[in-house]
Amino acid sequence: TDYVVKLGPNIADPYGSVTGQALTVRFRTGDQAPDLRLHIPDFVGTYNAYAPARLYASHVNVKRVDLKLYRLTPEDLLQQNSRDWYTNAPPASALVRQWSQALEAPLNKVSYAPIDAQEGGGPLAPGIYLLVASSPSLKDNNYGLRHLMVVSKINLTLKTFQDGALTWATDLQSGQPVAGLSVTFY
Protein backbone atom coordinates (compact mmCIF):
# COMPACT_ATOMS: atom_id res chain seq x y z
CA THR A 1 0.00 0.00 0.00
CA ASP A 2 1.29 3.45 -0.90
CA TYR A 3 0.94 6.31 1.58
CA VAL A 4 1.51 10.07 1.28
CA VAL A 5 1.73 12.27 4.38
CA LYS A 6 1.76 16.04 3.86
CA LEU A 7 2.92 18.36 6.65
CA GLY A 8 2.18 22.06 6.46
CA PRO A 9 4.77 24.79 7.23
CA ASN A 10 2.96 26.00 10.36
CA ILE A 11 2.77 22.79 12.40
CA ALA A 12 3.98 23.58 15.90
CA ASP A 13 5.37 21.36 18.63
CA PRO A 14 4.26 21.76 22.29
CA TYR A 15 6.93 24.48 22.76
CA GLY A 16 5.76 26.64 19.86
CA SER A 17 8.47 25.77 17.34
CA VAL A 18 7.09 25.46 13.80
CA THR A 19 8.36 23.39 10.89
CA GLY A 20 8.80 26.47 8.72
CA GLN A 21 8.40 24.56 5.48
CA ALA A 22 6.01 22.14 3.84
CA LEU A 23 7.08 18.53 3.81
CA THR A 24 5.75 15.53 1.88
CA VAL A 25 6.65 12.02 3.01
CA ARG A 26 5.91 9.02 0.79
CA PHE A 27 6.23 5.40 1.86
CA ARG A 28 5.01 1.97 0.94
CA THR A 29 4.22 -0.94 3.23
CA GLY A 30 5.03 -4.47 2.15
CA ASP A 31 2.75 -7.47 2.25
CA GLN A 32 2.00 -9.03 5.59
CA ALA A 33 4.36 -11.88 6.48
CA PRO A 34 2.93 -15.33 5.72
CA ASP A 35 1.32 -16.94 8.75
CA LEU A 36 -0.45 -20.21 9.44
CA ARG A 37 -1.99 -21.46 12.70
CA LEU A 38 -4.18 -24.36 13.67
CA HIS A 39 -7.20 -22.63 15.17
CA ILE A 40 -7.40 -24.71 18.35
CA PRO A 41 -7.86 -23.81 22.01
CA ASP A 42 -4.83 -25.80 23.21
CA PHE A 43 -2.15 -28.27 22.17
CA VAL A 44 -4.34 -31.24 23.19
CA GLY A 45 -7.94 -31.60 22.04
CA THR A 46 -10.58 -34.27 22.55
CA TYR A 47 -12.69 -35.39 19.60
CA ASN A 48 -15.89 -37.40 19.35
CA ALA A 49 -15.24 -40.59 17.35
CA TYR A 50 -18.87 -40.52 16.15
CA ALA A 51 -18.43 -37.11 14.48
CA PRO A 52 -16.23 -35.86 11.62
CA ALA A 53 -12.72 -34.94 12.81
CA ARG A 54 -12.60 -31.35 11.56
CA LEU A 55 -10.58 -28.41 12.75
CA TYR A 56 -9.68 -25.07 11.21
CA ALA A 57 -6.51 -23.25 10.22
CA SER A 58 -6.14 -19.49 10.11
CA HIS A 59 -3.85 -18.27 7.36
CA VAL A 60 -2.61 -15.13 5.67
CA ASN A 61 -0.52 -15.05 2.48
CA VAL A 62 -0.12 -18.84 2.50
CA LYS A 63 -1.17 -20.79 -0.59
CA ARG A 64 -0.78 -24.37 0.69
CA VAL A 65 -0.71 -26.31 3.93
CA ASP A 66 1.04 -29.69 4.13
CA LEU A 67 -0.33 -32.06 6.75
CA LYS A 68 0.77 -35.29 8.41
CA LEU A 69 -1.38 -37.36 10.74
CA TYR A 70 0.36 -39.84 13.03
CA ARG A 71 -1.34 -42.46 15.19
CA LEU A 72 0.30 -42.82 18.60
CA THR A 73 0.10 -45.54 21.19
CA PRO A 74 -0.37 -44.66 24.87
CA GLU A 75 3.27 -45.69 25.35
CA ASP A 76 4.36 -43.26 22.58
CA LEU A 77 2.45 -40.53 24.33
CA LEU A 78 4.07 -41.21 27.70
CA GLN A 79 7.57 -41.39 26.18
CA GLN A 80 7.04 -38.28 24.07
CA ASN A 81 5.61 -36.34 27.01
CA SER A 82 9.14 -35.74 28.31
CA ARG A 83 10.38 -34.49 24.92
CA ASP A 84 9.81 -31.34 22.95
CA TRP A 85 6.67 -31.84 20.84
CA TYR A 86 7.75 -29.10 18.43
CA THR A 87 11.04 -30.66 17.35
CA ASN A 88 10.49 -34.41 17.67
CA ALA A 89 8.40 -36.36 15.20
CA PRO A 90 6.90 -39.79 15.72
CA PRO A 91 8.45 -42.64 13.73
CA ALA A 92 7.54 -42.82 10.04
CA SER A 93 5.76 -46.11 10.74
CA ALA A 94 3.17 -44.17 12.79
CA LEU A 95 2.17 -42.02 9.77
CA VAL A 96 -1.42 -42.81 8.75
CA ARG A 97 -2.13 -39.95 6.35
CA GLN A 98 -0.14 -37.29 4.50
CA TRP A 99 -1.71 -34.68 2.25
CA SER A 100 -1.57 -31.10 1.00
CA GLN A 101 -4.44 -28.67 0.90
CA ALA A 102 -4.65 -25.53 -1.25
CA LEU A 103 -5.57 -22.33 0.60
CA GLU A 104 -7.29 -19.40 -1.05
CA ALA A 105 -7.65 -15.91 0.36
CA PRO A 106 -7.20 -12.29 -0.71
CA LEU A 107 -3.69 -10.90 -0.23
CA ASN A 108 -3.01 -9.67 3.34
CA LYS A 109 -6.37 -10.90 4.67
CA VAL A 110 -6.63 -13.45 7.48
CA SER A 111 -8.87 -16.32 6.39
CA TYR A 112 -9.95 -19.67 7.79
CA ALA A 113 -9.89 -23.07 6.11
CA PRO A 114 -11.46 -26.33 7.32
CA ILE A 115 -9.10 -29.27 7.74
CA ASP A 116 -10.58 -32.75 7.76
CA ALA A 117 -8.25 -35.17 9.54
CA GLN A 118 -10.01 -38.11 7.87
CA GLU A 119 -10.08 -38.14 4.08
CA GLY A 120 -13.59 -37.27 2.91
CA GLY A 121 -14.53 -35.65 6.20
CA GLY A 122 -15.47 -38.72 8.22
CA PRO A 123 -14.70 -39.60 11.82
CA LEU A 124 -11.34 -40.95 12.96
CA ALA A 125 -11.12 -44.32 14.69
CA PRO A 126 -10.72 -44.01 18.47
CA GLY A 127 -7.08 -43.43 19.41
CA ILE A 128 -4.40 -40.81 19.94
CA TYR A 129 -3.19 -38.82 16.93
CA LEU A 130 -0.65 -36.09 16.29
CA LEU A 131 -1.50 -33.66 13.48
CA VAL A 132 1.49 -31.76 12.10
CA ALA A 133 1.00 -28.83 9.71
CA SER A 134 3.64 -26.98 7.70
CA SER A 135 3.89 -24.77 4.64
CA PRO A 136 6.64 -23.88 2.18
CA SER A 137 5.56 -20.23 2.64
CA LEU A 138 6.69 -20.21 6.27
CA LYS A 139 10.22 -19.83 7.52
CA ASP A 140 11.17 -21.63 10.74
CA ASN A 141 8.14 -20.71 12.84
CA ASN A 142 6.15 -23.86 13.58
CA TYR A 143 4.42 -22.65 16.75
CA GLY A 144 0.75 -23.57 16.74
CA LEU A 145 1.16 -26.12 13.94
CA ARG A 146 1.02 -29.34 15.96
CA HIS A 147 -2.05 -30.72 17.67
CA LEU A 148 -2.54 -33.82 19.77
CA MET A 149 -5.97 -35.31 19.05
CA VAL A 150 -7.52 -37.72 21.55
CA VAL A 151 -10.41 -39.42 19.72
CA SER A 152 -12.92 -41.47 21.71
CA LYS A 153 -16.49 -42.77 21.74
CA ILE A 154 -16.49 -42.50 25.52
CA ASN A 155 -16.91 -39.49 27.77
CA LEU A 156 -15.17 -39.70 31.14
CA THR A 157 -16.15 -37.62 34.14
CA LEU A 158 -13.57 -37.72 36.91
CA LYS A 159 -14.15 -36.89 40.56
CA THR A 160 -11.14 -36.92 42.86
CA PHE A 161 -10.93 -36.78 46.61
CA GLN A 162 -8.17 -36.95 49.20
CA ASP A 163 -7.43 -40.66 48.95
CA GLY A 164 -9.11 -41.80 45.76
CA ALA A 165 -10.93 -41.12 42.54
CA LEU A 166 -14.20 -42.06 40.89
CA THR A 167 -14.91 -41.95 37.18
CA TRP A 168 -18.12 -42.24 35.17
CA ALA A 169 -17.90 -43.52 31.60
CA THR A 170 -20.73 -42.81 29.17
CA ASP A 171 -21.11 -43.39 25.44
CA LEU A 172 -20.89 -40.09 23.53
CA GLN A 173 -23.66 -41.06 21.11
CA SER A 174 -26.24 -42.68 23.39
CA GLY A 175 -25.31 -41.13 26.73
CA GLN A 176 -25.62 -44.57 28.31
CA PRO A 177 -23.09 -45.85 30.89
CA VAL A 178 -20.29 -48.01 29.48
CA ALA A 179 -20.10 -51.24 31.48
CA GLY A 180 -16.97 -53.26 32.14
CA LEU A 181 -14.53 -50.58 30.98
CA SER A 182 -10.99 -50.85 32.29
CA VAL A 183 -9.61 -47.40 33.17
CA THR A 184 -5.94 -46.69 33.89
CA PHE A 185 -4.84 -43.49 35.63
CA TYR A 186 -1.34 -42.13 34.92
Question: What positions do the PLM features span?
Answer:
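N-terminal, cleavable Sec-dependent signal peptides of secreted/periplasmic/extracellular proteins
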Residues: 1-186
